[in-house]
């Protein structure tokens, strides 16, 4: 897929990876970009910088997502690419409240589902369209110190796989973005932001922290190649291959790595058992 001449919608587009993609799409010739974010001021500012449209929206509100899709199709034109990108991270293991998991599932999984079922009928009717869903390397591997993040990002990857398998014959292409650490506000947006600094939960930065521009470069290459996995950190492909080759060995290695990342009295197991 080439973005030139296409209309794109980007959720979580006011900052971080989303903003980087908005700016890159514009630079590479997108006809129009709709910037969606719960931060209305930020969405409008980013949209104004690229001559696009800024819209405030809670991505867990299905009616609001459907309205954005319908309005864009009616007033701007056919959506060629929908980027479902909003997300955040928290600390917690088995002891964490189920309500926290429910909220994260809404943002990381249901938001992707709502977008897909709003936009795919339009795309299928035209015989073409592209979905780019942001997940995480945690969705292919795991996430030390955040059970909810690991669960929901795996679910996000699974949802993207299902959509690709089920709607591919209708001309729907799907890619899933699975980065490790990126300079963004995903941690600062977390209710556990202060607690996360300097803990083993920051293992995602072990292979370096990329800029949003770095991620955008990888995304554009993947879109052109229509590649399902978008891996800004090349090391992730090797980790996934090792996991697939011998999952028991991989789990053992992850156990040892997690043990080295947390002081014994702060190990995630102690959050439930106390020791």
Over which residues does each language-model region extend?
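The beta1-alpha1 cofactor-binding region of Rossmann-like NAD(H)/NADP(H)-dependent oxidoreductases
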Residues: 40-41, 57-67, 98
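Conserved glycine-rich Rossmann-like NAD(P)H-binding loop of the short-chain dehydrogenase/reductase
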Residues: 30-45
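Active-site-adjacent segment of SDR/Rossmann-fold oxidoreductases
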Residues: 28, 141, 162-173
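Active-site helix of classical SDR
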Residues: 116, 152
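SDR active-site lid
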Residues: 166-234
């Amino acid at each position: 897929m080439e973005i030139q001449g296409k209309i794109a919608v980007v959720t979580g587009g006011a900052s971080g990876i989303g903003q980087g993609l908005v700016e890159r799409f514009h630079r590479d010739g997108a006809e129009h970009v709709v910037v969606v974010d719960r931060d209305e001021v930020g969405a409008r500012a980013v949209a104004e910088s690229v001559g696009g449209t800024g819209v405030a929206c809670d991505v867990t509100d299905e009616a609001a997502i459907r309205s954005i899709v319908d309005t864009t199709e009616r007033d701007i034109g056919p959506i060629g690419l929908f980027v479902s990108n909003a997300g955040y991270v928290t600390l917690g293991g088995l002891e964490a409240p189920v309500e926290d998991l429910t909220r994260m599932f809404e943002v990381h999984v249901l938001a992707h589902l709502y977008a897909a079922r709003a936009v795919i009928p339009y795309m299928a009717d035209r015989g073409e369209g592209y979905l780019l869903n942001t997940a995480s390397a945690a969705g292919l591997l795991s996430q030390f110190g955040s059970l909810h993040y690991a669960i929901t990002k795996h679910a996000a990857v699974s949802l993207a796989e299902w959509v690709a398998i089920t709607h591919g014959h209708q001309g729907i292409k799907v890619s899933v973005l699975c980065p490790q650490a990126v300079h963004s506000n995903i941690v600062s947006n977390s209710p556990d932001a202060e607690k996360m600094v300097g803990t083993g939960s920051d293992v995602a930065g072990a292979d370096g922290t990329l800029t949003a521009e770095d991620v955008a470069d990888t995304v554009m290459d993947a879109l052109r190649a229509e590649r399902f996995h978008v891996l800004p950190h090349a090391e992730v492909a090797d980790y996934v291959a090792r996991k697939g080759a011998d999952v028991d060995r991989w789990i053992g290695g992850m156990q040892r790595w997690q043990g080295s990342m947390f002081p014994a009295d702060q190990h995630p197991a102690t959050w439930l058992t106390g020791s």
